[in-house]
Amino acid sequence: MAPQKIALLTDSCADLSPRLAAENHIYIVPLRILCADGEYSDGVDIHSADIYRRLKAGELPQTSLPSAESAGAVLEEIRDAGFDGVIAVMLSSGLSGTYNLVRLIAEESGDAFPIKVFDSVSGSLGQGLTVLQLAEDIRNGMDWETLVERRTPQLIAGTFPFFSVDTLEYLMKGGRIGKVTATAGTLLQIKPIITFAPDGQLQ
């Protein structure tokens, strides 16, 4: 029998506020942020303002995928809340292993608790808006089969986020662009428009 009460799962890179997430039955798996003084959970005990402050001080925090334990705990919380199915839309697999982590957990859960996991091929605004649109579709009564077979793939395929950055320094330090590209862009004062390639990496 197809799930009737459907929850949504995403990760902290969707940049959804706690209020928006709670209002829309969206559960968040926090990525880990590795800093000089320890490990933090994104959006839980470290926030964007903290990260920007560290960057300005010369530190380069690194992201890491959530632990299997934390992802499993969120799924257990969803089940305990009375939901009987989950649609998960995760950060682009070209940037993180979060999608594959949740996919493996979903495979282990079997058919007893259906979890359909999608690679957003996106992040931040693109990922978050996809999840919010699915929340609206669920409120409007869209059924499980339509959501997982058609609607979610359509939303992902039709989402094209573009963004720019003030400096190329952190993209270079994080390994997202090469040193030559970053140096040339800085010297020429170029601020490129960045988006996601079909493989989910930044281009």
What are these regions (language model features)?
Residues 70-102:
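N-terminal glycine-rich phosphate/adenylate-binding segment common to multiple enzyme folds
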Residues 46-52, 81, 103-108:
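A short glycine/small-residue-enriched secondary-structure motif
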